[in-house]
């Protein structure tokens, strides 16, 4: 129970370039995992960011896959066992939304990073929808306060309107841009003064808002403005209540500058104190409580070649209940066979270390020799199937062909491993037998091509295919389904699970099929 209580497993999510990876790095700095944070600036890497470990990420300065990192952390002034923090740093780039959606099934809470100048952006909106669907509590960090941006109240209004959630500031900025003096920590009633480019220490002052000491620290004008702002904050926004945050009704808001390491420690200190410990997980059969004695877990991500020196696959397993023990036999539910793991690992981005045990909330890396698929369940014998790992209907489609006949084996292996990772979806057209890759954005095609060449020594060629939508289909009457598949043979494909997929080449074809075959159900995600 004690081990469960001290765990905090969360994702950091944002629109591209809001400062998500930089914030992750600074958390690791406070957790003692790294000595210097590598800031991503203007899409060029000043020092390589720890959490962006794949070659293509280092080249382009964007995150294209979820990184998993863990560290122990105890806020200043607290005593006892440290909190065990598990961070999942997700891709901000919109092309990799699906990886982020899957990651949100493995966390108990989330921190959303918002650019103070740009406010709520398209990707922020989408990610918040997924958090709302799963009732995931969120904290919002308004970043880049050291740059000229929008009025803090305007940003808060936009957050409430666009993200459809009530907010409650727990810190408040004093000026911004060139006039940025620091933040007042409402939660701790403490003044934090801003000094640019400090790696670790900021000046903290215990000060009463109504005292003259405040004027001496920030200036009379700024102090008067802060008092006025705080009066408005306390009048407009409800008093903070931890339970309304944990039930995803209210989002606490912090202000700061991740690049300058400002406001980050206050965010982390408050987060570990108020964020939920591991929550129950819904399986198809029943609700699984973390306190249960028997181990259960599910695979939410697979990554090939996490170590370029050893061509290896790692399956990321979220522990849901009980205790995971190295070398213990567990049931692989889908395969119906017993498996053991002699070298389970935990992560600091690309650095990993072997562990002997893990508890609910932990993310464990399991060596994968091809036995895992995303969504697989491990138990001590019980037949359980965890929910909530859908594939979404892709937006873009291309035929993929092997462009180096002598490298056919490498091409097949690379395509299979990338497909198992969930980088993109792969369909086999039943009419002509050709493989079709479906993605949510153009960048995914580039990533597949790059990784096939650099990790598998294989080459691929893309050819255009005109498709509008991929739908998973089902019917209560098997004969009706067979009849549809015969009538629409040229549009039929199979996905990697062998499920029937209807590939419509236009909106008209799709709507006519739905109209003419009313007993067929068309689904736009694979989970139905």
Where are these regions (language model features)?
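Structural and coupling elements of P-loop NTPases
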Residues: 1-528
């Amino acid at each position: 129970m004690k081990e469960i209580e001290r765990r905090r497993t969360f994702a950091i999510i944002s629109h591209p370039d809001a400062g998500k990876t930089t914030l992750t790095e600074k958390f690791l700095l406070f957790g003692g995992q790294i000595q210097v944070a590598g800031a991503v600036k203007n899409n060029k890497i000043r020092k390589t960011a720890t959490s962006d470990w794949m070659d293509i990420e280092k080249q382009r300065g964007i995150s294209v896959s979820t990184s998993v990192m863990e560290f122990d952390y105890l806020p200043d002034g607290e005593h006892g066992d440290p909190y065990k923090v598990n961070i999942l740093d997700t891709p901000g780039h919109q092309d990799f939304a699906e990886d982020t959606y899957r990651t949100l099934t493995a966390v108990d809470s989330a921190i959303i990073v918002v650019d103070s100048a740009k406010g709520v952006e398209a990707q922020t909106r989408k990610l918040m929808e997924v958090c709302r669907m799963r009732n995931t509590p969120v904290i919002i960090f308004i970043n880049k306060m050291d740059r000229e941006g929008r009025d803090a109240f305007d940003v808060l209004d936009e957050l409430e309107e666009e993200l459809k959630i009530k907010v409650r500031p727990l810190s408040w900025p004093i000026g911004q841009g060139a006039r940025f003096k620091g933040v007042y920590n409402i939660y701790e009633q403490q003044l934090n003064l801003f000094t640019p480019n400090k790696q670790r220490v900021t000046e903290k002052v215990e000060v009463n808002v109504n005292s003259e000491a405040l004027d001496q620290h920030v200036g009379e004008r700024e102090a008067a403005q802060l008092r006025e702002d705080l009066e408005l904050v306390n009048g407009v926004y409800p008093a903070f209540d931890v339970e309304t945050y944990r039930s995803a009704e209210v989002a606490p808001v912090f202000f700061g500058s991740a690049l300058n390491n400002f406001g980050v420690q206050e965010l982390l200190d408050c987060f570990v104190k108020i964020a939920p410990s591991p929550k129950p997980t819904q399986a198809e059969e029943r609700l699984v409580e973390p306190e249960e004695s028997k181990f259960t877990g599910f695979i939410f991500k697979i990554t090939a070649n996490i170590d370029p020196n050893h061509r290896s696959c790692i399956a990321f397993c979220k522990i849901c209940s009980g205790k995971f023990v190295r070398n213990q036999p567990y049931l692989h539910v889908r395969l119906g066979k017993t498996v053991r793991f002699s070298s389970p690992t935990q992560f600091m981005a690309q650095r990993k270390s072997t562990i002997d045990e893990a508890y609910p909330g932990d993310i464990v890396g399991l060596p994968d020799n091809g036995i895992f698929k995303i969504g697989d369940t491990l138990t001590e014998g019980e037949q359980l199937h965890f929910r909530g790992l859908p594939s979404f209907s892709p937006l873009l489609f291309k035929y993929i062909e092997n462009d180096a006949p002598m490298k056919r084996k490498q091409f097949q292996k690379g395509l299979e491993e990338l497909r198992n990772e969930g980088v993109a979806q792969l369909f086999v057209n039943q009419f002509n037998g050709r493989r079709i890759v479906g993605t949510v954005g153009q960048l995914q095609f580039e990533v597949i091509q790059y990784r096939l060449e650099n990790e598998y020594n294989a080459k691929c060629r893309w050819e255009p295919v005109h498709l509008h939508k991929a739908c998973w289909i089902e019917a209560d009457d098997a004969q009706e389904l067979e009849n549809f598949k015969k009538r629409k043979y040229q549009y039929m494909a199979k996905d990697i699970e062998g499920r029937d997929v209807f590939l419509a080449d236009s909106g008209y074809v799709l709507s006519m099929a739905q109209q003419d075959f009313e007993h067929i159900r068309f689904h736009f995600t694979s989970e139905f």
